């Protein structure tokens, strides 16, 4: 392919050179592209997308999208390096392609699952539902880089179900659609990747639902939306064509009705976090995050949007350049400052693109090799890297100067007072305060800065006349209480975070004023565990538990507690939302009570897990009754339905944040039973996992059901038995060793227990079984390397103990039925030793090791323990378990 433009561009791009050299760019397609600005019409004409969708040819769709990206990126590189295009063309072209790719993948995924499950229908409007995709960040502002990932959020209009024979809830349907969309774009194949897809900006991040309804999004933004999320949503843009109400519900969250000067502190804080990371990681040469970089230009534009956008709709824009221009037009910023920022922004973005053109990598760091530096300088129009560096620094210094002028820290104030009040004064004596803080063991500067942030912050300054004196009275007491802890700085930081969190709820401030005896207890709890501190921040209503007489009472009467919960649910009068909130408040209270007792050393890990499992059992039983009562079109008063627990729930090894592995079974001859109980299963799962105003209950995992994600949500007991006998894999029988009946119809319990016993006591070829389990262990190594610091997956760690026990059950329960009792791994090791199946000494050592591992895992979560330290004691435990493994299996699993 001969073209001077190609020769010039390939000199500055290894990526382009590779595409040209390996023949991946056909001249008849590529050369005409170089003479025009690409549009959606060009993307549409590249392949017969309708045919691919009609044929449900997923592999071909993925291939064509990746091939199209190769052409688009190569075209952008050639035109930009040759100065045919400008920054706006580059960013708009790649963003338009991202929009096209998202919509093409979405159309395919939607049609694929619509054909499988029917069209999703709104519960209230009774109209077909479509998924809206919101592009965030640079994708939202038409500002993508060629090697950017894309930040997306998935939103659908309303809850409901599909209208097909294999009915699915809209939440499940759109989750599947979203997952396939992500895979089509994100998966790396032989043809490469379309875009890295980042979903972490969605509500609750990685822990949140992949898709959510508009109502759920609105509720989240109102009740939980944080300042940084306002910043993120400022650029949010719906890239799909379907009707939606997203803009109207997001606008009041991002753009407040008043002049929101709290945005200054929020933006400073965000910038400090970024600056800290930049400093920590030595990223001064990062033209995006370093001083005077792209991010500072973006912050300047967005700070004025955050403050004034609610009153000036003209500022409710997506792009950085258009926002800066509008700031000049409206007189908010001097025109000369805006021109300075625009020139710097264009220069920095051009540099960023050239860094990424080199090898199609998402980088913003200047090169270190002389050769690449010279090439970069030449591509930017400079004769030498030194001249380029001088030009770059001029732009960065100007940006940083303007940034510091606009977002400078407020002046510190000083004055004094007496006793612990010295810690919280309008004008503190800084020298005295720092000295006293150091005297009491605090990181003085960190605490003083935090106290000043609170006093100067939006929340404190806008407290009511009643709330502010209460707030003022609590701060010195928190400082005093934190000083008594082993880690005063961390403790006080958490207490102050909590106080600020609850400050708008005057009732919580009044509680702390009225019950000062709880402050020391609160400090002790928060000092010991950032997890409990976060839990209290999430559910501050739990403060009331601190004055409960039962707080440290370890005598949990679950039957009595279940009865009390039942009464509370009945009092809701059938109000679904009220019942869901009641379940959540009950569960949160018991978890908090257990956590406080745990911190006080009143529980072993094993006993605590028993209590957390009993709590889950109680919640599941209550939720099942509520979900059935809430079901329309049911054919009987009492469901012939049961819940079986697997994994940690089944083995009674739940932790505070464990999800629930569930399998739903039914035994009902009614012709509509399958449909009815599938809907019940879906409804029950929603009852458990949906976040309401009172929070959430449990994350659920239903993948251990027959046929996994491809299987029905609920199975008849007959189908379950048939599957276990004829189709289940060995690993599914391993899972069955930890399964137990939780709640539901007694007859199903009897049938399940029988099936479990018969399956686990079936005659097996022990050599073949051993080989399969070793192979299963080997399959874990690529995704979970057996590092010694990971007590779960290390050789001789938690998984090895579990596999040993599971093998002993599957191989020997026929002869020793006492192995069938679900007592947990520690007890089962002892039983196996008593049966003569394993050496008693090794069994005892492995029990000790397993207890040690569980304590390590538990403390990492609860007590802020660092990553497990590889000590001689730990290695000795690994060694003992490995000895037992070799005794049982004769060989260890191979890593390769």
Swiss-Prot record:
Xref: HAMAP family: GlnE
Concerning its family, UniProt says: Belongs to the GlnE family.
Q: According to the entry, what is the taxonomic lineage of the organism? A: Bacteria, Pseudomonadati, Pseudomonadota, Betaproteobacteria, Neisseriales
Chain's role: Involved in the regulation of glutamine synthetase GlnA, a key enzyme in the process to assimilate ammonia. When cellular nitrogen levels are high, the C-terminal adenylyl transferase (AT) inactivates GlnA by covalent transfer of an adenylyl group from ATP to specific tyrosine residue of GlnA, thus reducing its activity. Conversely, when nitrogen levels are low, the N-terminal adenylyl removase (AR) activates GlnA by removing the adenylyl group by phosphorolysis, increasing its activity.
Cite the entry's keywords alphabetically. Answer: ATP-binding, Magnesium, Multifunctional enzyme, Nucleotide-binding, Nucleotidyltransferase, Transferase
Q: Which NCBIfam families match?
A: PRK11072.1 (NF008292)
Official protein name in the record = Bifunctional glutamine synthetase adenylyltransferase/adenylyl-removing enzyme
User: Which residues lie within the region annotated Adenylyl removase?
Assistant: 1-411
Renumbered to this chain, region (Adenylyl transferase) spans: 417-896
Q: Which GO terms describe its biological process?
A: regulation of glutamine family amino acid metabolic process
Pfam families tied to this protein? GlnD_UR_UTase (PF08335), GlnE (PF03710)
Q: Which InterPro entries match?
A: GlnE, GlnE_rpt_dom, NT_sf, PII_UdlTrfase/GS_AdlTrfase
Broadest EC class?
transferase
A molecular function GO annotation: magnesium ion binding
GO cellular component, alphabetical, reads: cytosol
Cofactor or coenzyme needed: Mg(2+)
Task: Tell me what reaction this enzyme catalyses.
Answer: [glutamine synthetase]-O(4)-(5'-adenylyl)-L-tyrosine + phosphate = [glutamine synthetase]-L-tyrosine + ADP; [glutamine synthetase]-L-tyrosine + ATP = [glutamine synthetase]-O(4)-(5'-adenylyl)-L-tyrosine + diphosphate
Q: EC number(s) in its UniProt entry?
A: 2.7.7.89, 2.7.7.42
């Amino acid at each position: 392919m001969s073209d001077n433009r190609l020769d010039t561009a390939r000199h500055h791009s290894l990526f382009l050179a590779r595409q040209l050299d390996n023949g991946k760019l056909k001249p008849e397609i590529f050369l005409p592209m170089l003479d025009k600005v690409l549009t959606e019409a060009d993307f549409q004409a590249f392949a017969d997308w309708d045919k691919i969708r009609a044929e449900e040819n997923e592999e071909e769709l993925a291939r064509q999208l990746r091939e199209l990206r190769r052409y688009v990126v190569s075209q952008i590189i050639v035109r930009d390096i040759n100065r045919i295009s400008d920054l706006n063309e580059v960013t708009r072209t790649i963003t338009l392609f991202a929009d096209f790719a998202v919509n093409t993948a979405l159309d395919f995924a939607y049609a694929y699952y619509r054909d499988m499950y029917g069209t999703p229908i709104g519960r209230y409007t009774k109209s077909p539902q479509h998924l809206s995709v919101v592009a965030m960040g640079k994708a939202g502002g038409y500002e993508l880089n060629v090697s950017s990932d894309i930040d997306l959020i998935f939103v659908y209009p309303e809850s409901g179900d599909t209208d097909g024979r294999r009915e699915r809830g809209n939440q499940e349907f759109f989750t599947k659609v979203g997952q396939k969309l992500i895979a089509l774009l994100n998966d790396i194949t032989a043809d490469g990747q379309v875009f890295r897809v980042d979903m972490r900006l969605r509500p609750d991040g990685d822990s949140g639902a992949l898709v959510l309804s508009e109502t759920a999004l609105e509720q989240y933004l109102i009740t939980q939306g944080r300042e940084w999320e306002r910043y993120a949503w400022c650029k949010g843009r719906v890239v799909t064509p379907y009707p939606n109400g997203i803009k109207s519900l997001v606008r009041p969250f991002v753009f407040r009705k008043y002049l929101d000067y709290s945005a200054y502190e929020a933006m400073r804080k965000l910038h400090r976090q970024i600056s800290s990371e930049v400093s920590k990681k030595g990223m001064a040469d990062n033209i995006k995050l370093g001083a005077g970089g792209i991010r500072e230009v973006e912050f300047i534009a967005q700070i004025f949007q955050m403050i004034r956008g609610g009153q000036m709709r003209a500022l409710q824009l997506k792009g950085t350049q258009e926002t800066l221009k509008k700031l000049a037009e409206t007189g908010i910023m001097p025109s000369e400052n805006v021109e300075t920022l625009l020139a710097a922004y264009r220069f920095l973005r051009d540099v960023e693109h050239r860094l990424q053109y080199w090898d199609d990598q998402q980088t913003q760091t200047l090169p270190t090799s002389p050769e690449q530096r010279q090439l970069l300088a030449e591509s930017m129009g400079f004769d030498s890297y030194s001249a380029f560096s001088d030009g770059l620094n001029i732009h960065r210094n100007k940006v940083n100067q303007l940034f510091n002028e606009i977002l400078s820290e407020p002046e510190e104030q000083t004055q004094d007072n007496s006793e612990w009040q010295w810690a919280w004064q309008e004008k503190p004596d800084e020298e005295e305060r720092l000295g006293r803080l150091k005297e009491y063991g605090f990181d003085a500067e960190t605490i003083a800065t935090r106290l000043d942030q609170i006093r100067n912050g939006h929340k404190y300054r806008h407290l009511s006349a009643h709330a502010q004196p209460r707030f003022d009275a609590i701060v010195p007491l928190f400082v005093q209480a934190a000083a008594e802890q082993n880690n005063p700085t961390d403790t006080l930081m958490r207490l102050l975070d909590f106080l600020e969190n609850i400050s708008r709820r005057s009732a919580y401030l009044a509680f702390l004023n009225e019950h000062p005896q709880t402050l020391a207890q609160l400090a002790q709890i928060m000092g010991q565990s950032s997890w409990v501190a976060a839990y209290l921040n999430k559910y501050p209503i739990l403060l009331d538990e601190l004055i409960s007489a039962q707080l440290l009472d370890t005598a949990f009467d679950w039957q009595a507690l279940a009865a009390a919960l039942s009464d509370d649910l009945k009092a809701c009068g059938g109000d679904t939302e009220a019942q869901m909130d009641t379940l959540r408040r009950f569960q949160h209270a018991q978890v908090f009570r257990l956590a406080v007792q745990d911190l006080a050393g009143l529980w072993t890990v094993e006993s605590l897990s028993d209590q957390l499992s009993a709590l889950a059992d109680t919640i599941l039983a209550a939720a099942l009754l509520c979900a059935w009562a809430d079901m329309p079109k049911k054919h009987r008063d009492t469901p012939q339905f049961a819940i079986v627990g697997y994994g940690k729930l089944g083995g009674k090894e739940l932790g505070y944040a464990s999800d629930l592995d569930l399998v739903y079974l039914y035994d009902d001859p009614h012709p509509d039973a399958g449909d009815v109980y599938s809907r019940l299963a879906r409804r029950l799962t929603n009852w458990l996992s949906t976040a309401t105003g009172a929070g959430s209950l449990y994350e659920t995992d239903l993948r251990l059901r027959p046929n996994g994600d491809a299987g029905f949500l609920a199975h008849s007991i007959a189908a379950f038995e048939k599957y276990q006998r004829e189709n289940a894999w060995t690993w599914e029988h391993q899972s069955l060793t930890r399964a137990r009946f939780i709640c539901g119809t007694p007859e199903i319990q009897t049938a399940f227990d029988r099936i479990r016993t018969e399956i686990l006591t079936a005659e097996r070829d022990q050599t073949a079984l051993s080989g399969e389990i070793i192979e299963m262990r080997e399959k874990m190594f690529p995704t979970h390397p057996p590092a010694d610091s990971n007590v779960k997956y290390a050789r001789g760690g938690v998984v090895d103990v579990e596999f040993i026990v599971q093998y002993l059950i599957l191989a020997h329960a026929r002869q020793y039925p006492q192995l069938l009792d679900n007592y947990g791994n520690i007890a089962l090791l002892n039983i196996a030793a008593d049966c003569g199946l394993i050496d008693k000494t090794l069994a005892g050592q492995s029990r000790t090791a397993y207890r040690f591992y569980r304590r390590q895992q538990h403390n990492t979560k609860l007590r802020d323990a660092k990553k497990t330290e590889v000590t001689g004691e730990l290695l000795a435990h690994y060694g003992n378990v490995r000895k037992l493994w070799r005794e049982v299996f004769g060989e260890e699993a191979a890593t390769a």
